[in-house]
């Protein structure tokens, strides 16, 4: 049969199978793409330290693996307008700061003969979102503990200073709802700045961001059609995971009609030089937002397949949790094979860091592995390393003179064993004590919660009681007793109304 007759017939059937309008691309643009494979490697770009947060091992999430098998599909060049991502994405993060309210406390306990015990503590001071912008703030470098204020034969004499200070923190912004997304927020997202975090004394404040209605852009891509069922399957463009169209529907947003894809992205698809627009039935609900970004298992369909690489990642996750340690090789299992906005991870000095950043496809790695060439780039670039040194990068990449890439190393006969060296994972510290890490006397300092009682109630003294009970003779008698019984006493414990320790590791 003449192909000039069969092709229009096949494309007309697409409308019936996918409940969309008639699709009639130019037959001259048809191209069969049987093997559109994943790139060998992906790597973050522009993922600086202020976009990362320390996380517990339980918060690691394996990447989605999208089915990029295109056998049996026909690809048609098309124009795609997306509200979320494109080839020239720009800044996907919103700049901001964590605002901390912390009481710096110095505690002095003095014995009868003048011996002193000095303690230092940080105390959470509850900070509301309304209060966050009401006071002038300083920087972490300007913080200090007050000088001790000691009294003879008195325990737990406190000298307090309250500071409001900021630390830089950028977060991802939902391009549709303009919600702020970050693991530091309660529930993983915040609707309006200032935003409350998991810590009662820390609030995030940032810019409003760019309205979604003004951020759409047109990119080039392909529309894939199943040869047998004649259904529209997906749309693709470099720099994004495939847009699944199995359960696509039409929804109104910003005064325009958009295709809501299987994972919630909003796109529009034009073909035949913009003469035709792809459409679907109306959505039954009006939900708009980046579905699935906060929970890896929030939305699963047949675009996400149970693949070998995903199983390897789940096994790596189980090993990390059971041993409370991580190696560069295990961390490499959490790298997404798809370019675009992805969860990224790094390991550094006992901590695992997480962020959501743009990743690019790597087409070529230099022979010494110190640089790479991104897809469509003409020059080589050094690997980004967020911690300011030349050792640790993202997803297990490490090394000084020779860069070790676990994804490549596992294929060679003489692999570098450094990718198997474990790092014990520390509990995630409270963010308000990070400023103290450069001090030398901070081993006993930790963050504490503030109880409801008056801070001054911890001040107590024997001296008024001594004076009232008989003056000098009683004082001498008390001195003899102190010599006999108290000279070798251990360090004075905290008062009975002690402030409970704050353990961030309990956070899920």
Swiss-Prot record:
Pfam families in the cross-refs: Rhabdo_glycop_CD (PF24833), Rhabdo_glycop_FD (PF00974)
UniProt entry tagged with the keyword Membrane: yes
Task performed by this protein: Binds to specific receptor at cellular surface, bringing about the attachment of the virus particle to the cell. Plays a major role in the determination of host range restriction and virulence. Class I viral fusion protein. Responsible for penetration of the viral nucleocapsid into the cell cytoplasm by mediating the fusion of the membrane of the endocytosed virus particle with the endosomal membrane. Low pH in endosomes induce an irreversible conformational change in G, releasing a fusion hydrophobic peptide.
Native source species: Infectious hematopoietic necrosis virus (strain Oregon69)
Subunit details: Homotrimer.
Identification of the protein by name: Glycoprotein
InterPro entries in the cross-refs: Rhabdo_glycop_CD (IPR055447), Rhabdo_glycop_FD (IPR001903), Spike_prot (IPR002417)
GO cellular component: membrane; viral envelope; virion membrane
Entry's localization field: Virion membrane
Residues in the Virion surface compartment per record: 21-461
Chain positions carrying an annotated carbohydrate: 56, 400-401, 438
TM annotation in the entry: 462-482
Signal sequence region: 1-20
